[in-house]
Curated annotation (Swiss-Prot):
Entry similarity comment: Belongs to the flotillin-like FloA family.
Protein's UniProt name: Flotillin-like protein FloA
Any one of the GO CC terms: plasma membrane
InterPro entries attached to this UniProt entry: FloA
Species classification: Bacteria, Pseudomonadati, Bacteroidota, Bacteroidia, Bacteroidales
Statement: the UniProt record of this protein carries the keyword Transmembrane helix: yes
Amino acid sequence: MIEPNYLPFILIGGGIIFVVLFFHYVPFFLWLSAKVSGVRISLVQLFLMRIRNVPPYVIVPAMIEAHKAGLSNITRDELEAHYMAGGHVEKVVHALVSASKANIELSFQMATGIDLAGRDVFEAVQMSVNPKVIDTPPVTAVAKDGIQLIAKARVTVRANIRQLVGGAGEDTILARVGEGIVSSIGSSENHKSVLENPDSISKLVLRKGLDAGTAFEILSIDIADIDIGRNIGAALQIDQANADKNIAQAKAEERRAMAVALEQEMKAKAEEARANVIQAEAEVPKAMAEAFRSGNLGIMDYYRMKNIQADTSMRENIAKPETTFGNEPLSK
């Protein structure tokens, strides 16, 4: 049984706990702020938000902002559903208010769809009002005269809200602009015409409709800078000349090797013929002896042949060139 002396303290403690729980589950001051702002919402609805794990401090300020901006068609249930789907309620309401003030057509369904697709819908609306400037990386291209040009461009784009869901992003814009610059410079007769009229590149690229299928609308393309690079044509000609020279040297080396091989083959054949001659000369004494035995060769015939051999040897010695050793001529 509770002592009478402790009863006031228990009642005070219970009252404090009740007040804390009440203000936790029922944000009274938030409800009061909504009432003052003209937003119709009950304490029961705020309590049910807590039960559904929907923070009232996200939904109610968004409702107040929409009501003050004249967007009375946005309901509490729609905001709760968008929050529970993982969306950003504050950004969606900010975007709708900005679009309404800028006379941009944007419905709640479109805004929530853009937000759930992972796009920043508020930034998209801001970009529709204030176009964004994108600087392209250096684009390298070669004119028909072989001179390399390095161009930098600035692309002014505006968000196309209707294409934000499923439309390509900035990377696609940069890639298409770079492709257009390369095509424009590559079709120029010489690099001087590009340097004299850089706006011709912008006009040609804009006519191609590079923003088709993207989340942006290209407003202008301005060539910020053009630098002259290497002489690619001359470099290619030098490389081709070096390649032709290497091929000619390889063919000449091949012909030289074939000539050396043929020379060695001829030397081998000459040595073979010389060996055959020596072998045939070795058979001469045998034939002469056989001729003496058979009586086909007489003594006078033998001496006559020896005289002929001596004359032949003398002529060969006379015909041989003299070699010198120091100042003394030597005969082999």
